[in-house]
Amino acid sequence: MRLNTLSPAAGSKPEKQRRGRGIGSGLGKTGGRGVKGQTSRSGGGKVRAGFEGGQMPLKIRLPKFGFFSRKSLVSAEVRLNEIAMVEGDVVDLSTLKQAGVVTKNIVFAKVVLSGNIDRAVTVRGVSVTKGARAAIEAAGGKIEE
């Protein structure tokens, strides 16, 4: 016995039905497609997502709202516990990028009160929230605008 000589037992697999080959086959005439309509046609039923057959699509019926701020693509929030990952006493945009806290495309960063900081750091050129400012100054650090 070899792998290339194996075949299924006789009668274990039904023969493929040939569509549209007469009434006696059970799938004659319309071949299981029903009568008329888009899905009965060759290549029919393939429509793009959101297409509603010519009816005004839901996406267009609903009103437009809001906008996408492009500044959000170049802005980031920095938590206090992420500042602890920065080596050295001075924290600015370049040191945050070197430490991998923010990505290289970030232009604006803001330190927010989340987590805690246990060492004195000087935050330079990065905006800081009131709560984060209090926490940094309580740890002996300072903020330079």
Swiss-Prot record:
Keyword hit for Disulfide bond: no
Start-end of Gly residues biased regions: 22-35
GO biological process: translation
Gene3D superfamilies: 3.100.10.10
Stretches for region Disordered: 1-50
UniProtKB keywords: Ribonucleoprotein, Ribosomal protein, RNA-binding, rRNA-binding
Domain of life: Bacteria
PROSITE patterns in alphabetical order: RIBOSOMAL_L15
Single GO term (MF): structural constituent of ribosome
Pfam families on file: Ribosomal_L27A (PF00828)
InterPro entries: Ribosomal_uL15, Ribosomal_uL15/eL18, Ribosomal_uL15/eL18_sf, Ribosomal_uL15_bac-type, Ribosomal_uL15_CS
GO cellular component: a single term: cytosolic large ribosomal subunit
This protein's record includes keyword Ribonucleoprotein: yes
Coiled coil: none
Assembly with partners or alone: Part of the 50S ribosomal subunit.
Similarity section: Belongs to the universal ribosomal protein uL15 family.
NCBIfam families membership: rplO_bact
Protein task: Binds to the 23S rRNA.
Protein name as annotated: Large ribosomal subunit protein uL15
Top-level taxonomy: Bacteria, Pseudomonadati, Pseudomonadota, Gammaproteobacteria, Aeromonadales
